[in-house]
Amino acid sequence: MAHPNPVYVGMDLGTFKTSVASSAGYRDVTPTAVGWPKDHIARALLGRDVVFGPDLTEHRLALDVVRPFEKGVLKYGDPAASGLTREQVETHMLATRLVIDYAVNLVTPDGHAAGRPVYGVIGVPSRASLKNKQFVMDAAAGVFDAVAVVSEPFTIAYGMNRLADTLVIDIGAGTVDICPIYGVYPADAEQVTVGLGGDAVDEEFEKRLRAKFPKVQVSRNMVREIKEKYGFVNAVGEQAVVNLPVDGKPTPHDVTEPLKAACLALVNPVVTAVRGLISRFDPEFQQRLRNNIILGGGGSQLKGLDRVIEQSLAEYGGAKVTRVSDATYAGAVGALKLAMNMPPQGWTALAGRPKATKPVAVAA
């Protein structure tokens, strides 16, 4: 597996967004989604067969958009129990591969063109099954020459050089991953994945918003933007007043109550999982874990979440929670650092695997 001059890539393949960084000195972020023009008119308008990035939102009415990891199903859950047909699973596989390829091209503008192999470390949920990991590796075939699939929270800890006595909570759109770090790569059984995340908060917020303001017209993108700007879980001192259309007219609405209730829906499952995981270790190590909790992922930006977690552990002896300094790139930068330090036996060769072909019909 050794090569004198590969390009290394670290990738946080998120449910909603994918962040990526490379040893070539580039980093970027893109939606984990692919759009196909709905018909020949849309194809002529867009001038291409596949759409990525900001154009997915701008032209969403003209596109069949696929988010392959929506609600974490194919990254964490059982594809057979997902309700997806075989054709839909194949379409999601293709969408995943196209996202990976697009993201890698963003940060390796001269990678393959210069004849250099590309080695990548990809982060997945803590308790992703072998089937889930294989899905990601199969999707990476034809993009990377070699790959390593690792726990997402571990990449955060590795990037911060917090490799001992640390508990990482990575709150993504589809899952919350909790991982203890104590000087070695953690075993799967020692980690926890909670099958909800930012998507569940968006869903709950939209439901409560429509119940309180039945005349309001909102999209899921609008709901997500409000949450990302105003989301909070602390007791007092926050207010969220936003303009929302009613019969086409922007009208101020106080969404504080439904927003807080939706965000709080994330707290109890996370706190319960953290308490349960910490209790598995001996008392001395429990204290060290509680006093060195790292909060990462997009959900870490909810105002007051760090304090709420600390308060929830007060009766267990207290805790110290620190947010990552850059929630967008912490996982990708850590994965890149891990890739650059990976021993040859840590890589799985992918060269020679077939690339995906475009399906005849795209399942919505």
Write out the residue ranges for each language-model feature.
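Gly/Thr-rich phosphate-binding beta-strand-loop-beta motif of the actin/hexokinase/Hsp70
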Residues: 1-29, 160-188, 205, 234-238, ...
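The start of beta-strands in P-loop NTPase/AAA+ ATPase cores
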Residues: 7, 118, 147, 164-167, ...
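Conserved phosphate-binding loops in N-terminal lobes of ATP-dependent enzymes
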Residues: 9, 15-121, 270
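Residue-level signature of catalytic and energy-coupling elements of molecular machines
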Residues: 18, 34, 100, 140, ...
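Phosphate-binding glycine-rich/basic clefts of nucleotide- and phosphate-handling proteins
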Residues: 37-57, 182-267
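Helical "lid/coupling" subdomains associated with nucleotide-phosphate turnover
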Residues: 87-99, 148, 155-159, 202, ...
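Active-site neighborhood for divalent-cation/phosphate handling
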Residues: 91-162, 183, 198
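Phosphate/pyrophosphate-binding loops at sites that engage ATP/ADP/AMP, CoA/4′-phosphopantetheine
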Residues: 103-118, 213-219, 274-292
